[in-house]
Amino acid sequence: MSGTDKVRVNVSQTAQTPLHTSAKLPKVGVLLVNLGTPDGTSYGPMRRYLAEFLSDRRVIEWSRLIWYPILYGIVLNTRPRRSGRLYDRIWNHENNESPLRTYTRAQGEKLAKALSDQPNVVVDLAMRYGQPSIESITDRLLQQGCERIVIFPLYPQYSATTTATVNDKFFEALMKKRFMPAIRTVPSYEAEPVYIDALARSVEKHLATLSFKPEVILTSYHGIPKSYSDKGDPYRQQCLETTRLLRERLGLGEDEMRATFQSRFGPEEWLQPYTDETVKELAKNGVKSVAVLNPGFVADCLETVDEIGNEAAEEFLENGGENFSHIPCLNDSEEGMKVIETLVRRELLGWV
């Protein structure tokens, strides 16, 4: 038989055998990731959580030779008990978990329901620090047959300390795999109309429930060291942009809505103005009514419920203020879920 005849036979045989035995669509994973939470409020769980969090080089950029003796010699021997007492004040004792885990799970469940028109989409959630870990949930998505994954760091404003470290950990998990799925990561959305509108509606709804009208509304964001911003982290500018757009959407003046930064840690200068100092100054200057919201947090947690709802409120009232209200995060509200669903559907275009 000639070479030409052999080719003809092979082509004929190939033509009779379909390349794909079925038209089944490959699964697409959607992974929601938030900061994280301890598994409990006692010393052990708190120490494990803080050790993982404060060992992240994206979070603490100091030389390990300087930082580790401080971390393991001082911080992890003193801070777990104090942080545990704070967490205990907001702990969801019914489910034995922090509000962050409660709300993030609800967000995942509601997103899965909203995407039920896409049967090949699998929604799951993970935490950057603590459980469920990014690595374990990445494994689960791959085991379910996900050939493409959209990873959604749940941070409206980008920072290397938040969004970047989530992506770092995700790709670190994939480095151990033979098969690497196609990846998309949801970018920051500090100026997205659906997000600004959701914040505005949330503020309007909350203010309608109050017996007073706030003279000043603070948009309080988690701070980062000023040196990180000076080196090029766009976080501060994105926070200010969110506040500017929200202020315009609500028709407020610059004195009526101001951006501040909270949760500073350590001796370094952080982004200013500081939230705690601002509420104290407002009270001392005669402002009697204040409201605070946290646009950078998609779910209520220790930094919002306790640091703002309790500590900032106490600072304001103890220094002459009369009315203080914390505006809840978007959480799994209708407005909040519209933001998450809109951004996820946009990233799924061409994949489903």
Curated annotation (Swiss-Prot):
CDD domains: Ferrochelatase_C (cd00419), Ferrochelatase_N (cd03411). Its EC number is 4.98.1.1. GO terms for cellular component: cytoplasm. It catalyses: heme b + 2 H(+) = protoporphyrin IX + Fe(2+). Keywords: Cytoplasm, Heme biosynthesis, Iron, Lyase, Metal-binding, Porphyrin biosynthesis. It is found in: Cytoplasm. Fe cation binds at H222, E303. Pfam families: Ferrochelatase. InterPro entries: Ferrochelatase, Ferrochelatase_AS, Ferrochelatase_C, Ferrochelatase_N. One of its GO terms (molecular function) is metal ion binding. GO terms for biological process: heme biosynthetic process. HAMAP family: Ferrochelatase (MF_00323). Catalyzes the ferrous insertion into protoporphyrin IX. Belongs to the ferrochelatase family. This is Ferrochelatase. It comes from Brucella canis (strain ATCC 23365 / NCTC 10854 / RM-666). The gene is hemH.
